[in-house]
């Protein structure tokens, strides 16, 4: 819809390539970008909250075309920033670094670019 387009246009997404397909990264407090990007066919979406520093990485659900697994990304990010709280969802399709619901979680010091570099390599 139009609203989607407006939201999309105000956000500067960074597009990158992964072995699973195209990814896109955002620095925004707007969580709807993840759903929008997935609708547009991005296999991997990263959102970093510029205020709190938290990161969310999501992949598309398993399909004939793609079956992404964030385990190696999780291990690599844990090595790079062991202080931060990293949580790999049981389905291996979602990697969270802190949520608003858990105030004890420590946001990562890594920049969005650092995280994108890992996603490009792994």
PLM regions and their residue ranges:
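Gly/His-enriched, cation/cofactor- and phosphate-binding structural elements
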Residues: 2-122
């Amino acid at each position: 819809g139009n609203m989607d387009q407006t939201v999309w246009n105000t956000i500067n997404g960074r597009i990158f390539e992964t072995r699973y397909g195209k990814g896109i990264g955002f620095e925004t407090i707007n969580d709807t970008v993840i759903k929008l990007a997935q609708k547009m066919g991005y296999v991997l979406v990263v959102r970093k909250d510029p205020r709190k520093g938290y990161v969310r990485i999501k992949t598309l659900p398993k399909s004939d075309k793609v079956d992404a697994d964030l385990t190696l990304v999780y291990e690599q990010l844990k090595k790079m920033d062991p202080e931060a709280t990293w949580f790999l969802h049981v389905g291996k399709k979602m990697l969270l670094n802190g949520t608003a619901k858990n105030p004890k979680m420590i946001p990562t010091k890594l920049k969005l670019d650092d995280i994108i570099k890992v996603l490009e390599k792994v």
